[in-house]
């Protein structure tokens, strides 16, 4: 690893952790209803939203009512987004005359953005109108992120309350997440991105003359190029901050009008993990012990750092096939070195690998390089990060409530080892809690493995595989890992825009999102009804380095046992073939 390669990740993590503390404290105050400067400014808008929706902010919900509100609201959003896509040909703000999106692709896209996955089987600048991008995708970027944050807050209330029947109001949590957190941060980031050259406007696509004419596939001369435009900066800000990831343009943040400079690249990378990291501090403050938040953040950071080093090292080592031909792949003052296939020369190896690790540690899925072109072991890192359940930082809200399920499992395992009923923050962890935590871990994993098996054994799935052998299998495995874990990134060599993949991955995204949310809320309701148990001599401290190690081991062990056989058939075999 070069000096630059070591400095960039270190600077990134330092800034990330430094900003996460004040932001986490601020978010805790928002969810606890503490009034501050933002409340005095945005309070009237919050109250207006409640009146317009007919919501009583002081009326809390049982966990079943909370879950019903989540499902109903998200279903309504999915249907509206589907309708927008099907009708965009006759709706305004469509200067390029985009036609209606086909039914299977419209379903896939609606399921994708409603579930905070942002899997894209289309090219944004060639498929969707400005209205669909803004009123459809942009709105879902906000509310899907706010949904995950709301579910997390409900779980935290379940942990902290005693003998209570309610876990809060979904509508209040949704509005506060959007109004006080996501909107201000998105506005700030959008302005910064515009200052760096990210486009923002409603004009049609622009034409520019080429310096040198070229010929197309038919032999005709091409003398000008079309430059796509649109309201990109506003959507890019929330797609990064909300761990959504769906790009305004087809190549996402590798596009020079979506990510033009080194500063915009750093800001967009920082935005991916900012809220997930800060929510760890929010958790610590809301449970009354900040050490708990630091412990969870330490486990996340440890896994992230190790896998980041593995990804950078694998990409910097280059391609053995090119080395055999005498190609110079060493880093120097004139080149980044390593495996530069599928990467922007302006970003190089380290920034590309850092983004890939961050975007799959979180359920973001945006890219500034093509993951399909990574080396087998370099591509294994983002693949396995998703398969761990998107709990290494993870999505906004969803990452932390997923990690807390692993905390429950780790506490239970520790209790078994000492023969004592496990406890977490004064609440006994019993059979029901273990069942719910197990469902959260099992549903995405089963969806990934079953979906991959169906795809590689049926004609509809096989038609989309253009690369034979282990890499083709890796592409299918990556697609279902991305969909079921609500990430949205892809190995781009898979022909995913087909009725089979649009339907199968669409279903996988819905299962991976909502079959997880319901057990999490059920666990929250169960914990809220329990009494607090005083800590005793046999209580396992959950803020120590020992517990951080136990939690890290639990996450890695579950991920290894579940997916190592599948990984052995894909990237591991491909690596062995490449190096023999």
From Swiss-Prot:
Protein localization: Cell inner membrane
Q: How does it sit in the membrane?
A: Multi-pass membrane protein
Which InterPro entries does the entry mention? KdpA (IPR004623)
**Which residue ranges run through the membrane?**
3-23, 65-85, 136-156, 179-199, 263-283, 293-313, 399-419, 436-456, 504-524, 546-566
Report whether Cell inner membrane shows up as a keyword of the record.
yes
Give the superkingdom in one word.
Answer: Bacteria
One Pfam family name is: KdpA
From the UniProt annotation, give the residues forming the signal peptide: none
One GO CC annotation? plasma membrane
Which keywords fit this entry according to its UniProt record? Cell inner membrane, Cell membrane, Ion transport, Membrane, Potassium, Potassium transport, Transmembrane, Transmembrane helix, Transport
Coarse class of the protein's main subcellular location: membrane
Q: Which family does it belong to?
A: Belongs to the KdpA family.
Q: What is the recorded function of this protein according to its Swiss-Prot or TrEMBL entry?
A: Part of the high-affinity ATP-driven potassium transport (or Kdp) system, which catalyzes the hydrolysis of ATP coupled with the electrogenic transport of potassium into the cytoplasm. This subunit binds the periplasmic potassium ions and delivers the ions to the membrane domain of KdpB through an intramembrane tunnel.
Q: How does it assemble?
A: The system is composed of three essential subunits: KdpA, KdpB and KdpC.
Annotated NCBIfam families: kdpA
In Swiss-Prot or TrEMBL terms, this protein is called: Potassium-transporting ATPase potassium-binding subunit
From what organism does this protein derive?
Sorangium cellulosum (strain So ce56)
């Amino acid at each position: 690893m070069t000096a630059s390669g070591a400095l960039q990740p270190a600077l990134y993590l330092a800034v990330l952790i430094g900003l996460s503390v004040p932001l986490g404290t601020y978010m805790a105050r928002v969810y606890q209803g503490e009034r501050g400067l933002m409340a005095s400014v945005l309070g009237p808008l919050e109250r207006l939203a409640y009146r317009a929706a007919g919501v009583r902010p002081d009326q809390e919900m049982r966990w079943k009512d909370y879950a019903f509100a989540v499902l109903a609201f998200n279903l309504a959003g999915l249907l509206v987004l589907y309708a927008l896509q099907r009708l965009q040909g006759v709706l305004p703000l469509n200067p390029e005359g985009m036609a209606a999106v086909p039914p299977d692709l419209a379903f896939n896209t609606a399921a994708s953005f409603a579930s905070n996955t942002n899997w894209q089987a289309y090219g944004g600048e060639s498929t969707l109108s400005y209205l669909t991008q803004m009123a459809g995708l942009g709105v879902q970027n906000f509310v899907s992120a706010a949904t995950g944050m709301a579910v997390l807050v409900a779980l935290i209330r379940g942990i902290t309350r005693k003998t209570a029947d309610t876990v809060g109001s979904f509508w209040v949590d949704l509005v506060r997440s959007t109004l006080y957190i996501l909107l201000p941060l998105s506005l700030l980031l959008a302005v910064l991105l515009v200052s760096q050259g990210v486009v923002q406007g409603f004009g049609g696509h622009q034409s520019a003359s080429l310096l040198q004419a070229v010929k197309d596939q038919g032999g005709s001369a091409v003398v000008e190029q079309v430059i796509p435009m649109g309201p990109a900066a506003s959507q890019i800000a929330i797609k990064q901050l909300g761990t959504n990831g769906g790009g305004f343009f087809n190549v996402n943040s590798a596009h020079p009008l979506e990510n033009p400079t080194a500063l915009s690249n750093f800001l967009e990378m920082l935005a991916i993990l900012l809220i997930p990291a800060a929510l760890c501090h929010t958790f610590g403050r809301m449970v009354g012990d900040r050490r708990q938040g630091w412990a969870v953040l330490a486990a996340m950071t440890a896994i992230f750092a190790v896998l980041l080093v593995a990804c950078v090292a694998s990409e910097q080592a280059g391609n053995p096939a090119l080395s055999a031909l005498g190609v110079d792949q060493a880093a120097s003052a004139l080149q980044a070195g390593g495996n530069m296939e599928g990467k922007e020369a302006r970003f190089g190896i380290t920034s590309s690998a850092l983004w890939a690790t961050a975007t799959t540690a979180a359920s973001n899925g945006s890219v500034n390089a093509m993951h399909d072109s990574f080396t087998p072991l370099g591509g294994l890192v983002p693949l396995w990060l998703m398969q761990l359940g998107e709990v290494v930082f993870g999505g906004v809200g969803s990452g932390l409530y997923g990690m807390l399920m692993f905390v429950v499992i780790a506490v239970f395992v520790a209790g078994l080892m000492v023969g004592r009923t496990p406890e977490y923050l004064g609440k006994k962890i019993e059979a029901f809690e273990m069942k719910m935590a197990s469902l959260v871990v099992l549903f995405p994993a089963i969806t990934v493995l079953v979906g991959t098996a169906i795809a590689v054994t049926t004609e509809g799935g096989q038609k989309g595989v253009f690369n034979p052998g282990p890499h083709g299998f890796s592409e299918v495995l990556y697609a279902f890992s991305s969909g079921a874990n609500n990430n949205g990134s892809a190995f781009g060599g898979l022909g995913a825009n087909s009725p089979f993949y649009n339907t199968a991955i669409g279903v996988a995204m819905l299962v991976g999102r909502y079959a997880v949310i319901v057990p999490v809320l059920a666990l929250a309701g169960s914990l809220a009804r329990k009494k607090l148990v005083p800590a005793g001599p046999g209580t396992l401290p959950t803020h120590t380095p020992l517990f951080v190690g136990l939690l890290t081991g639990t996450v890695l062990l579950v991920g290894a046992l579940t997916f190592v056989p599948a990984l052995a058939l894909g990237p591991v075999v491909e690596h062995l073939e490449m190096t023999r």
